[in-house]
Amino acid sequence: MSRARISNYRKGVAAVALSAALAGAFVVTGPLGALNEARAEAVHVTPPPQAGFADLVEKVRPAVVSVRVKKDVQETSNRGPQFFGPPGFDQLPDGHPLKRFFRDFGMEPRGDSRSDNRRGKANKPRPGHERPVAQGSGFVISEDGYVVTNNHVVSDGDAYTVVLDDGTELDAKLIGADPRTDLAVLKINAPKRKFVYVAFGDDNKVRVGDWVVAVGNPFGLGGTVTSGIVSARGRDIGAGPYDDFIQIDAAVNKGNSGGPAFDLSGEVIGINTAIFSPSGGSVGIAFAIPSSTAKQVVDQLIKKGSVERGWIGVQIQPVTKDIAASLGLAEEKGAIVASPQDDGPAAKAGIKAGDVITAVNGETVQDPRDLARKVANIAPGEKAALTVWRKNKAEEINVTIAAMPNDKGKSGSQSNDNDGGQGETLDSYGLTVVPSEDGKGVVVTDVDPDSDAADRGIRSGDVIVSVNNQTVKTAGDINKAITAAEKSGRKAVLLQLQSNDQSRFVALPINQE
């Protein structure tokens, strides 16, 4: 074949190949367009096996109840001005739903203008009757109808009604209440009925970030379910000496008090008790009593109707950074004994003012609140080994736990009539002091408002009893104690103060110039 023919043959083949390629391109374009149209269809996602809490709620909800509380009201008369009812109440027509609502709750208009005929017997003194005063939530913990709720829900009541999830209303009686932990137990009056109930779980296994489900009766609406997570542990909200709340962000509102917070196993890990809210509604900050605390209290309330706690009889305060430095402690942990109560268990065992209790039965004490809880959980009559820090070393003291006595309010303050004369000035601390009349310590007569002493709350009239656990009677004794502390390398000195029959410790930094 000549070169010319070969060249023409190659050109022909190339042309055919190009035509085929173009044809193929058009063939492929059709299906690609169809694929694009398929991709425009709605996306369908298969849900995970556990998409919600419906199964859990279905099982636990029958055990959650609403609690209605009523109180006996003394004889009243409808004549004259009334103190209940909103402005404009008397302008509402008879039969108006709001008027019926307020009257159902014992509220009457200010100056009811109805005629005597329309009042019927209402113009006569009404006999004592029960008026609703509170409502909250609770949950059944036994087949025979024991119900756990909050003390603040039932504390003002004389009669109690429990409303089950199906709407059944049953009378109940108060078995016992514990204001210190804000817990109470009711017993439903239905001896032949077997109730669905829930169990307490172990809140010590609950971690921050775990799911929780809250069930309750917000605003009296009836069984309502919300969910959230554990936001924090060990919260102290100033409600009492045993504060140790679990913080959750599930929606909790008024009326949820006493209701349960469940883990995903359907066990109660907390009792919803309080919320933090500037508006009165839920802002995602709720507090629940841990189940470990509740179980101990509830068991005692059912058995005895009251709670008996361990007690050692000490006034305690936190170990601050300055106090730790003044005592040679490596950590700001424990509780310093401001004063042991005369003839109390601690005093009898040899616990002294200035001792720092760092452990109970080998368990570290974090702070005064932790010490109070640990001691309270020990049965009266048992012995407890307290580890105390005294004179730069730890030692163990056995204390026989007693039952906590009933609170006795301390009356009035005690004034100090010592005019102090001229007094001596401790220039480095901005204090002027004079010896006390009974020879026990020195009395502070003046405090420089710009001094460290003023910043730490020392005031005129306070009595300095000791410095670094050394008794003092003069300003010279104080200076000697400060000098000794400085030579030993301490950065602060510990003052024991007495005021209004109360003892406390204050650490002042040593001014090293």
Swiss-Prot record:
Ranges for region Serine protease: 125-299
Enzyme type, top EC level: hydrolase
InterPro entries in UniProt: PDZ, PDZ_sf, Pept_S1C_Do, Peptidase_S1_PA, Peptidase_S1C
Top-rank lineage group of the source organism: Bacteria
Residue ranges of domain PDZ in the record: 300-391, 414-500
Signal peptide (from-to): 1-25
Entry keyword annotation includes Signal: yes
Compositional bias annotation for Basic and acidic residues: 101-119
GO cellular-component term (any): outer membrane-bounded periplasmic space
Keywords of this entry: Hydrolase, Periplasm, Protease, Repeat, Serine protease, Signal, Stress response
Pfam families assigned: PDZ, PDZ_2, Trypsin_2
Gene3D superfamilies xref list: 2.30.42.10, 2.40.10.120
Subcellular location: Periplasm
GO terms classed as biological process: proteolysis
Active site (catalytic residues): 152 (charge relay system), 182 (charge relay system), 257 (charge relay system)
A GO term for molecular function: serine-type endopeptidase activity
Substrates-to-products reaction catalysed: Acts on substrates that are at least partially unfolded. The cleavage site P1 residue is normally between a pair of hydrophobic residues, such as Val-|-Val
Assigned EC number: 3.4.21.107
Binding site for substrate: 255-257, 312-316
Family designation: Belongs to the peptidase S1C family.
Role, per record: Might be efficient in the degradation of transiently denatured and unfolded proteins which accumulate in the periplasm following stress conditions.
Record's protein name: Probable periplasmic serine endoprotease DegP-like
UniProt gene name: htrA
